Swiss-Prot record:
Function statement: NDH-1 shuttles electrons from NADH, via FMN and iron-sulfur (Fe-S) centers, to quinones in the respiratory chain. The immediate electron acceptor for the enzyme in this species is believed to be ubiquinone. Couples the redox reaction to proton translocation (for every two electrons transferred, four hydrogen ions are translocated across the cytoplasmic membrane), and thus conserves the redox energy in a proton gradient.
Listed GO CC annotations: plasma membrane
Organism in which the protein naturally occurs: Geobacter sulfurreducens (strain ATCC 51573 / DSM 12127 / PCA)
InterPro entries, alphabetized: NADH_Q_OxRdtase_suD, NADH_UbQ_OxRdtase_49kDa_CS, NDH1_su_D/H, NiFe-Hase_large
TM annotation in the entry: none
Enzyme class: translocase
Protein name, entry field: NADH-quinone oxidoreductase subunit D
Length: 390
């Protein structure tokens, strides 16, 4: 019997298909994967430790830089956790705008996913189309928050400001074009022979294994597990909206692709419902100890200026205790565990990033596959190193 030699190959950290500075040490028997050891940490910035030296409001910009493709989802999970510790109620208008922005963020993130996933496998046309559509959402981001990526728009107690005049019209014009674009993506990929051959039966992980590994989000639902925090543990008023939660059947890369496509259609559906229910009103809770004063007060009265300065420089005390809050981010369950000692800064903050947990299953999904198929598995997990390394 012929002996075989195991070859060790390094993929990354400078490799286009790893979607960031991810290094994987791969052991191969010929071209068949025997073992994968991910090496992370190249993008570590110490977000959790930095938060211990910043007030609760000053930590919000740090969360933008976790999954930098979905900044408002990061903001949302964090401010919900702090609001739970404070026990404050958020105005209905602010809740609705948060949902709209969270779903636009989901669309924006999924568009990057389908663009890069398709490009990794060789479908360049979808890459160009998806980035064209993403640009429309980026323009909305810029109009609302002043920034295209690191938005820093949500605040403890609500929003940094109300939306601009014409916001509803602009959002409707953008999302009304999306169903046609989704049809185009499906026409280019779903029945494409090369796409089907590269994704069907690839990266299989059973429902039981997916749960055991702690996988969440579209990767979990692609394995047939019907779980979505927006429906099963609702927050920000998601219980008011009607939407489908897609699940896969064959637990492979193709199923995860189909799940995300349907999720994009459902995000458009949720945004339409939220726009229909958007009512006039305040966008910040009436809690002067926590929320910033209106800008007109800051500019026109010394009391308002002092109020703003005190909150910005000293923060606000948060009752002693601990809390865990999770949201359904585009890549899965994003959770914040915050411990307060009664001061204006977190005593400890622990972030549960979905990409970090999902990456742990990469060997289970790819073992026994060809090394060329690993690119498709990485793409279907939709990882981002900003939140993995934190």
């Amino acid at each position: 019997m012929a002996s075989t030699e195991i070859m060790t190959v390094n993929m990354g950290p400078q490799h286009p298909s790893t979607h960031g500075v991810l290094r994987m040490v791969i052991e191969l028997d010929g071209e068949v994967i025997q073992k994968i050891t991910p090496h992370i940490g190249y993008l570590h910035r110490g977000v959790e430790k930095l938060s211990e030296h910043r007030t609760y409001h000053q930590t919000i910009p740090l969360t933008d830089r976790l999954d930098y493709l979905a900044p408002m989802s990061n903001n949302l999970g964090y401010v919900l956790a702090v609001e739970k510790l404070l026990g404050i109620e958020i105005p209905e208008r602010a809740q609705t705008i948060r949902v709209i922005m969270a779903e636009l963020t989901r669309l924006k993130s999924h568009l990057v996913w389908i663009a890069c996933h398709a490009l990794d496998i060789g479908a360049m046309t979808v890459f160009i189309y998806a980035f064209r559509e993403r640009e429309m959402i980026m323009s909305l981001y810029e109009k609302i928050s002043g920034a295209r990526m690191t938005s820093n728009y949500f605040r403890v107690g609500g929003l940094s400001s109300d939306v601009y005049d014409g916001f509803e019209k602009d959002v409707r014009e953008v999302i009304d074009t999306f169903p046609g674009h989704f049809d185009t993506y499906e026409g280019l990929l779903t029945k494409n022979t090369i796409w089907v051959n590269r994704t069907v039966g690839n990266g299989v992980i059973s429902a039981e294994d997916a749960v055991d590994y702690g996988i969440t989000g579209p990767a979990l639902r692609g394995s047939g597990v019907d779980w979505d925090l927006r429906r099963d543990n609702p927050y920000s008023g998601y219980e008011k909206y009607s939407f489908k939660v897609p699940v896969g059947e064959k637990c492979d890369t193709f199923d995860r692709y189909k799940v995300r496509l349907i999720e994009m259609r459902e995000a458009v559906n949720i945004i339409r419902q939220a726009l229909d229910s958007l009512k006039p009103g305040p966008v910040l809770a009436d809690n002067p100890q926590v929320t910033y004063p209106p800008k007109e007060n800051v500019y026109n009265s010394i009391e308002g200026l002092i109020h703003h300065f005190k909150i910005a420089s000293e923060g606000f005390p948060v009752p002693e205790g601990e809390v865990y809050q999770s949201v359904e981010a585009p890549k899965g369950e994003l959770g914040y565990y915050i411990v307060s000692d009664g001061g204006p800064k977190p005593y400890r903050m622990r972030i549960r990033p979905p990409s970090f947990v999902n990456l742990g299953a990469i060997e289970k999904m790819a073992k026994g596959s060809m090394i060329a198929d690993l690119v498709a598995v990485i793409g279907t997990l939709d990882i981002v190193l900003g939140e993995i390394d934190r």
